[in-house]
Amino acid sequence: MSDIEIIEEIQPVSLKRKQPSTSFNGKRKRTSSGLIEKSETMKGTETEFEKFVIDRTITPQRKLNAEDVEKSGEDIGSSEWRKRLECTLLGSVSTPVTVKKENNIRKKISCFNCDGEHNLRDCTQRKDFRRISRKKRESGDGRQRVFYNDVGISKQREKHFKPGVISDRLRAALGLRGNDIPEHIYRMRRLGLIDGYPPGWLRKSIKSTDQLKFFDSTSKEDDEMSVKPPELDTSKIVWYPGFNGEQSSLNDREDFKIPPRDVFCSVYQDELLKIFKKSEKAEKRRAKSTPKHKKFANEDDDDVIVITSDEIKIDKFNTPGEEDSIIILDGSASTEEKHLLTPIRKDVKLGESMFELIGTPVFGSSLLTPVAPLEAFAVGIQPFEAREELTGCKGNFRNLMDKLKEIRENNFVPEPEEEVILVSTNEISSSNNSGTAKNKNNQNRKRNRRHAK
C-alpha cells in the first residue's frame, strides 16, 4: 500500500477501551494510530520524516447556510472581502453585493508659497523659501506614510508579535482552549529537542565572536588565529510552552517531560561545540588534502649521483690559436663537492644575499650602458626670466565698464540720425520716365523756334 492510510471516522471512545479489529475478505484493515485516536483536534494521519512532518489531515466539508453566516457577520465587522466570499459560497441565496468603485479624484494643485490653485513657478507673489521647504516636507511625509501603512508590516505592528506566544484570537480560530497545546508543539517534539527548535532563533541566540586578523613583519602564512568556540546567549532563547517551557496548567495529551531551562541550555551548548569541532576537523582535512610543495636545503635528491675520485677526468681543450697551451676546466669547489655532479644548496635566511663575488671593484668597469649627462637634456631650453608687469596697461576693461555704467545712470540719449527716405524701384523708374519725356519736349520746342527764324 502507499503511504496514505485508510482513514476511518473516529468515534469518541474512552482511552482505556480499544476498538475491535474489523476484517474484510480475510484481510485486516489498517486503522489510524492510537496517538491520533486520542487526539480530539487531529482527524487524519501523518507521515513522519527525519526533519519534517507531512500532515494528511482530512477535514469534513460543511454546507453553509445564509442565516448562520448573517448571524456570524453581526459580531465581526463586515468587509468587502467577506461580502465577496459570501457571494461565491452561497450563490443565489444571498443577494449580490454591488461594490462601489471609488472615483480616483485627483488632488488639487496647491502652491507651496501662497496655497493657491497653481504651480509654484506660476506664483506671482514674493517667494518665502522657508514656507516652501516646510510645505514640501509635509507633503513628502504624507506620501511616505500612506505607502508604508498599506504595504508590509510596520515596526509598531511587529512589536505585537512575539515568538512562542499565541493570541486569544488565534486560539479561537484554531479551536484551542486556554490551556491546550497547539499542534505545532507536538510536531516539534517528534523532531527532537535539538532539531525541533527553530534554527533561525538558534542562530540569533549565538554570541558573535568575529575578530579581525592583523598581519605584521613577524607574521607567517602558517600562523592561524585561534577561533573561539561559539557561546549561547540564554537571554535570547525563545521558550515554547509544552516544548521547552514549563507550565503547570497545560493539557498535555502525551504526558511529555519538559526539561528544565538549565538542562535545555546546556544541551544546546554541547551541540554547538560538537558542530564547531566537526567544522574544525573538516578544515584540517581540507588543508592536508592540498599540501604546499616545499624543498628544504641539504635535502637528498633522487637525481644526485656520487662519483669516486678514480672516475674523475679532467677535460682538456686546445684553443685554435694556441696549440701548446692547455686550459683545465676545474671548479673551485671543495673536495667533497667535487664528487657531486650537482652543487649542494645552502641555507639562505631572509634578507641575506644569494651569492657573493670576491675581488676589488675596478672603477669604470661597469657593465651598464653609459647614460647621457644632465647638461645634454638642457639643450634648446631657454631659462625663465621673471619680468614685472606694466602698471599703466592694467584696468582697461574695468574703465570701459565704469564709463558704460555712468552713461546708463545719466540717461544719456543719443543724437537722432539723418532721416533716410526709402524709394521703391517702381517710383524711381516712373521718375526717370517723366524726366526723359520733359527733355524730349524741350528739344522739340528748340527745333520749332529755329525753323521759325
From Swiss-Prot:
Protein name (database record): Uncharacterized protein ZK632.11
Sequence segments annotated as region (Disordered): 15-42, 425-453
Pfam families, sorted: PSP
Annotated GO MF terms: RNA binding
GO cellular component annotations of the record: catalytic step 2 spliceosome
Compositional bias segments (type: Basic residues): 443-453
Composition bias, Polar residues: 425-437
GO biological process: RNA processing
